[in-house]
């Protein structure tokens, strides 16, 4: 029996051609739309910070006119000179660095140790202790009792008032404990068979395997410690050498609000009278303060980004 070839008619051939074209055009349109959308999103996200940088490098008297977008009209360093004119700003910077590093390291180590302990099913008091820590997330004694507690602990006007209260975090403990729950139990059991104790298991197995979530927690703790100024205002305001960078910048910003009308206040903030009257305004000072306070965290974030993205997915995938 002879083979018969069936050739498509003109109508079906045209339909096939249209489908092929549509299959080629649709991905191009989709990618083009996504690219345009992401470019717009990046511009919307980055422009406020870029504009803040522009304002910080522009003369304050000119900034009041408005219309600053991508480049300063009257470029000046005067805003940053006003920020760094105070001799206390450098000491405050190192206090903030020391506070941030110590708070982050101690919080990570102690909170992870607590999370590992409360993740062990054989621990008898696991549930009541977990409940106690969760309650601290909802109930706070308040500012005045907190101050008297710090006073009774002899932490007022000491560096450790920045570190000790932040050594344990209930929320971070819950996040880390959730991550520890994804680590195979067989690893712990094998280590115990080999004679390893709980602390050795924690240091050699659990802690290294928690790097992704610890990087995420480290970023949260570090940003919180770096940006904090209210505790310096409450607990160490009478001891200038313990002032933090954020507290000094906050005082400078507050002083600049009255700089034009009260040059004496400007001089107290490290600004000359000429700068206070013409080159520096509260808006330009605020922009410079924002940049100075943000740069250290922006420099650290790229190195943490890989672990940060992984850590955000903790608990989102159930194996």
Language model feature labels by segment:
Residues 2-319:
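A hydrophobic, multi-pass inner-membrane permease signature
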């Amino acid at each position: 029996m002879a083979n018969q070839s069936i050739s498509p008619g003109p109508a079906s051939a045209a339909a096939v051609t249209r489908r092929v074209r549509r299959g080629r055009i649709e991905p191009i349109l989709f990618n083009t739309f996504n690219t345009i959308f992401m470019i717009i999103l990046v511009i919307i996200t980055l422009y406020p910070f870029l504009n803040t940088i522009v304002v910080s490098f522009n003369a304050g008297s000119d900034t009041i006119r408005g219309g600053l977008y991508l480049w300063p009209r009257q470029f000046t360093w005067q805003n940053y000179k006003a920020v760094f004119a105070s001799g206390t700003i450098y000491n405050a910077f190192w206090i903030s660095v020391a506070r941030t590093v110590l708070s982050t390291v101690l919080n990570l180590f102690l909170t992870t140790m607590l999370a590992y302990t409360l993740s062990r099913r054989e621990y008898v008091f696991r549930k009541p202790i977990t409940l106690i820590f969760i309650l601290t997330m909802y109930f706070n004694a308040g500012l005045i009792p907190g101050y008297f507690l710090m006073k009774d602990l002899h932490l007022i006007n000491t560096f450790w008032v920045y570190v000790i209260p932040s050594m344990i975090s209930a929320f971070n403990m819950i996040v880390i404990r959730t991550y520890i729950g994804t680590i195979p139990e067989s690893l712990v059991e094998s280590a115990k068979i080999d004679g390893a104790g709980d602390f050795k298991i924690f240091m050699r197995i659990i802690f290294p395997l928690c790097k992704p979530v610890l990087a995420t927690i480290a970023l949260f703790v570090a940003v919180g410690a770096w940006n904090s100024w209210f505790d310096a205002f409450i607990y160490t305001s009478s001891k200038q050498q313990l002032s933090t960078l954020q507290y000094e910048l906050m005082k400078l910003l507050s002083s600049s609000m009255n700089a034009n009308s009260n040059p004496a206040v400007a001089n107290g903030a490290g600004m000359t009278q000429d700068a206070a009257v013409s080159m520096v305004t509260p808006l330009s000072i605020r922009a410079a303060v924002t940049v100075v306070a943000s740069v250290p965290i922006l420099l650290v974030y790229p190195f943490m980004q890989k672990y940060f993205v992984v850590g955000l997915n903790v608990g989102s995938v159930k194996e």
